[in-house]
């Protein structure tokens, strides 16, 4: 059986890891073992934070909608409840965009939601 020399592959693999760790501080960018650990952790953080970003944006949209709704004399909770009662399906991303860039359209949606809410919100629905 022929002898297999692995130096080229090993160097290529190590160079790829060290290039991926090039911006890190101290040993993490210079020593292979430390760089490999850090690159592995960085990929894990990257994956988890891509999932977390969705929740972060939803939280931001809700804060923006709530602030704009309160300027129009309503709370976020009542606004969403009123929009559902009026069968208006607008997601939070679009609502936040309207709240920031088109205050008149947002105010119109608040008005529609207010009219759709019953006078006593906690009263049971008439069947």
From Swiss-Prot:
GO terms for biological process: ribosomal large subunit assembly; translation. PROSITE patterns: RIBOSOMAL_L20. Coiled coil: none annotated. InterPro entries: Ribosomal_bL20, RIBOSOMAL_L20_CS, Ribosomal_protein_bL20_C. Keywords: Ribonucleoprotein, Ribosomal protein, RNA-binding, rRNA-binding. It comes from the Bacteria. One of its GO terms (molecular function) is structural constituent of ribosome. Belongs to the bacterial ribosomal protein bL20 family. This is Large ribosomal subunit protein bL20. It comes from Streptomyces griseus subsp. griseus (strain JCM 4626 / CBS 651.72 / NBRC 13350 / KCC S-0626 / ISP 5235).
